[in-house]
Amino acid sequence: MRKKKNKKTVADTGYKKVDRKEKKKKEKQEEKRRQKKLSVQQSIAYKEMGKDGICRVQGKTYSKCIRFYDINYQLAQNEDKNAIFENWCDFLNYFDASIHFQLSFINYKSSMKEFEQVIRIRPQEDAFDDVRMEYAKMLKQQLAKGNNGLVKSKYITFSIEADNIREAKPKLERIESDILNNFKILGVPAYPLNGVERLQILYETFNPDIMTDFQFDYGSMIRTGLNTKDYVAPTSFVFKDRNTFRMGNTIGAVSYLQILAPELTDKMLAEFLDIDKNLIVNLHVQSVDQMKAIKLVKSKVTDINRMKIEEQKKAVRSGYDMDIIPSDLNTYGGEAKRLLEDLQSRNERMFLVTALFLNTAKTKQALDNAIFQTAGIAQKYNCVLKRLDYQQEEGLMSSVPLGVNHIPMHQYYNMATMINADVHRLFPSIDITMKTRLNSRADFEVTVLAIKTYPMERRVQ
């Protein structure tokens, strides 16, 4: 009897083991099915957005965003211009290798009714009503021949690596304070964005065809059970095409700028931002560690010298003057030595820069026309605007001010490449427009960042 009982127990245990294996197998299959179900919210590349404006973008990456305005540079005295130029150099030199920063220039079309509401002047039924009506008529005429409802805004987003929010918050607040102080020295109005304001930028970027105001407060998340992504997400994302994408009823495309010219002026970026279409220009900038940058340039100088020696050996073997070597070697060699001198003795930094352009439109034809116009400006300055192939999703998420670059294509620049000596367009005279959907205060014309390139290191990875 005991033996039979033992056999039955063994058999029962075997059945239980089989059941457990099948159960685990089914659980794994269900988990795979759940992972395959993609959503719009999963495409939006951040984890959490706090009330104070601190965003956990991915893993250990945290970011904050500052909106900045403009100052009057053209009418300043020469001494003031020199001071602004030097302070702007110090501003860019502030960012070390531990801080990634992103400059965003956003142009979007707002409703003309919204502008008309701002300039509307109601009669007060007094002796000055005639003056008010005449002034209101003048404003409407200026609006009719103005910027067609184009609103321009600009932001700087900076991100750091930290183990948790407790470690990230004091670091981000210190960097924010330093940046605001640098802007104050420059005389540039600036203020940090809170969580709602940052979410509004995402909402307006992902929903350019929706003219309704952004409605959100953190208290509603508790009542509804939704998260912040649910409030900013469009109705759909479609990334099946090679070099375009769709978000809701809008079609868009992300391109990157390949700089081929030996030198650029700030006029190029100014022309990009003068386009009367929806356009977002982003410059992702990462400072290179000083020792690493010097080592890199030294290796380039060594490579150029080795190439010179090889050319001289060829000249001797061929029986002509060894001083006759390709002119490019002399040019690149001189540029490399000057760059090394700047890094070692002039307290300059080297930067990795990615320039991205996001065009959006309602139809494919309108998008092609906008991209053609943008590419024409790039071609005018001997640059190439290239569409991202099969990287439109990464390009879109790199084109919103979150402080993370998902596109690995970049170019090397030193401090002189980030600023042009002709900075009269860096801070142009103030041009007051109407209020934006972000804030009720007056908005100002876009500040233009000048870029001057060196031919020494011009590669796309």
Question: How would you describe each model-predicted region?
Answer:
Residues 422-461:
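Active-site-adjacent "gating/activation" loops or surface patches in catalytic cores
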Residues 2-428, 432:
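Extended, folded cores of ATP/NTP-driven motor/assembly subunits in large transport
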